[in-house]
Amino acid sequence: MNINKPLEILGHVSWLWASSPLHRNWPVSLFAINVLPAIRANQYVLLTRDNYPVAYCSWANLSLENEIKYLNDVTSLVAEDWTSGDRKWFIDWIAPFGDNGALYKYMRKKFPDELFLAIRVDPKTHVGKVSEFHGGKIDKHLANKIFKQYHHELITEVKNKTDFQFFINRLRGN
């Protein structure tokens, strides 16, 4: 459910950030970078139960160029980047009260024909990896084929970047 009051949304999302073991120690500057553009672009979902927030997800629709920028530095996105293309990236996925499954089902239903990528961070090692997600109506084999093309386009572009820091083998699943 999207709530139409931006300050109320910010309060709900900040509550979820503070309740998340991964997010609670992140600086306020990351909250501003990750949350404000999502609310402005209406690229978020906030699940509530009994008027209390239980899960939040935001996504950016990136161009290939901004996707590379994001992979190189996850704090680099500016407001305009969030609506720069058609390559969907989950920016935040927060479900600190056990509602991860509900959020997953909601997103697969909301975006039945869409593909998403995400950087998932291991809470113990703080190492990130790129993960793939697809809507509920997309055939898994077709999704894999499209993701393979996405990765090919990405790797081709990254090879031309001399200042890129992300480890390419992670994109290939090695």
Curated annotation (Swiss-Prot):
Belongs to the RTX toxin acyltransferase family. This is Protein-lysine myristoyltransferase HlyC. Heme binds at residue 151. Keywords: Acyltransferase, Cytolysis, Cytoplasm, Heme, Hemolysis, Iron, Metal-binding, Transferase, Virulence. GO terms for biological process: killing of cells of another organism; toxin metabolic process. Protein-lysine myristoyltransferase that catalyzes myristoylation of the protoxin (HlyA) at two internal lysine residues, thereby converting it to the active toxin. The gene is hlyC. It comes from Escherichia coli. It is found in: Cytoplasm. The active site is at residues 23, 92. GO terms for cellular component: cytoplasm. Proteolytically cleaved by the protease systems ClpAP, ClpXP and FtsH, leading to its degradation.
